[in-house]
Amino acid sequence: YLHGSAVMGCFNPKKSDIDLILVVRDEVKDTVKRQFMDMVVELNKQAPEKGLELSIVREAVCKSFVYPTPFELHFSVAHLNWYQTNPEDYVAKMKGTDKDLAAHFTIIYHRGQVLYGKDIREVFAEVSREAYMDSIWCDIEGAAEDILESPMYIILNLCRVLGYKEEGLILSKKEGGEWMLGKLAEKAS
């Protein structure tokens, strides 16, 4: 399932990653994870600069949403070196729970795209407002410090969180910025 900027109309090959959620029925064995990761590393070479970001989750946690959400495997460019230097360790340890998945599932549920498999509404339940809000709140917790390193990213992210908090809007960062500009224009007039 494709989510993120690629489905929200604001993909930028120089700034965006490709966000994917892969849904499986059963637990994935480490040998299969290793084979899969070897393919992912090769595919990542053809991806945009920020690469691929993907998580493998079990269907059961999508239908009966669990928060924080368990995952079978996760990959992003941030973890590439770990996998390349110690693939067995990576495959054995890259499993757990991730609060960020609530945000990803929400984007999929409302705006995602099926690349292969069942219809979104057959696989994913709607994430509760509380879980989604906590997920996006966790994403901005360090904003006061992070804004010095990535001001545009943080400001746009803050705008989209506020758009959800105030109006229940599921927005991309770009849309969050546009929403905020509209709010500021309203206040100015």
For the regions a language model picked out, list residue spans one by one.
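Terminal low-complexity, intrinsically disordered regions
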Residues: A143-E149, K165-G168, E186-A188
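A generic structural motif
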Residues: V24-V28, D146, L162-Y164
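Short, charged amphipathic alpha-helical segments flanked by flexible coils
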Residues: L169-A188
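Short, compositionally biased low-complexity segments
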Residues: C10, A188-S189
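Catalytic metal-binding acidic patch
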Residues: G4-E42, G51-R58
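Conserved NTP/Mg2+-binding pocket subregion across the NTase superfamily
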Residues: K33, D38-L148, I155
